[in-house]
């Protein structure tokens, strides 16, 4: 994904326990591999290890990168510096995630495979402002259009508008 003159790239593939995520300068070419024990170079602005998920994609919103791992571990990074703002288990644990998060205004939405939507504030600390249980499995990422949120579960499509 691209934001504010940077490209954000995650490599949370199966078998790579490090799961790095990095910000790269557009126009980088050739081998931009980081040397061991380094977190930046001419093309890589910053790199954080052990934060990228296997299935959910990351998002950048309100100057922060939100990365949720399949096991529910959420890492929030400063989008410019890559510094970790916080790392926590969404909902306190026990949830798994395939859906990518979405964001609007001062809220970020995470939908678990059990159909539980966690609504978080975009502040510098984990603040769960709402939790909605839909009662059935969901593997789809929510969508936002205008003032509506769309959530698909195994058998239903919900539109939540305000």
Annotated model-derived regions:
Residues 1-162:
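Noncatalytic, solvent-exposed loop/strand surfaces
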């Amino acid at each position: 994904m691209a934001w504010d003159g940077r490209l954000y790239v995650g490599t949370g593939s199966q078998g790579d326990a490090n799961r790095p995520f990095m910000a790269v300068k557009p126009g980088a070419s050739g081998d931009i591999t980081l040397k061991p024990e380094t977190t930046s170079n001419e093309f890589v602005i910053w790199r954080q290890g052990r934060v990228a998920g296997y299935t959910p994609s990351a998002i950048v919103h309100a100057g922060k990168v939100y990365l949720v791992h399949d096991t529910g571990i959420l890492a929030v990074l400063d989008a410019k510096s890559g510094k970790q703002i916080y790392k926590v288990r969404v909902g306190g644990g026990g949830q798994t995630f395939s859906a990518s998060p979405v964001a609007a205004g001062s809220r970020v939405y995470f939908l678990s495979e059990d159909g539980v939507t966690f609504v978080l504030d975009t502040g510098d600390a984990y603040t769960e402002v709402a939790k909605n249980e839909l009662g059935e499995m969901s593997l789809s990422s929510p969508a936002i259009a205008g003032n509506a949120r769309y959530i698909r579960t195994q058998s239903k499509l919900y539109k939540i508008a305000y």
